[in-house]
């Protein structure tokens, strides 16, 4: 769990913002959302494969767009 030390003469809002930023960097909220409901290992693999395929298609489309001639 991220811990911050409130500096001298630091407002509560600034300290809260620093804490939120440290939680975001640690990935705590994403972890909580992922663990909120049980997900079967097959659905995890299926979702990861889908994101992998989407990323690959995006990369290929970007390379093809770069290689097309514009005349």
Swiss-Prot record:
Task: Fetch the InterPro entries from UniProt.
Answer: Ribosomal_bS21, Ribosomal_bS21_CS, Ribosomal_bS21_sf
Q: Where is this region: Disordered?
A: 47-71
Give the matching Pfam families.
Answer: Ribosomal_S21
Which Gene Ontology BP annotations are present? translation
Instruction: Output the Gene Ontology cellular-component terms.
Output: ribonucleoprotein complex; ribosome
Instruction: Point to the regions of Basic and acidic residues compositional bias.
Output: 60-71
The UniProt entry's coiled-coil ranges are none
As one GO molecular function, the record gives: structural constituent of ribosome
What keywords were assigned to this record? Ribonucleoprotein, Ribosomal protein
Q: Which domain of life is it from?
A: Bacteria
Report whether NADP shows up as a keyword of the record.
no
Q: Does the keyword Signal apply?
A: no
Record-stated family: Belongs to the bacterial ribosomal protein bS21 family.
Its recorded name reads Small ribosomal subunit protein bS21
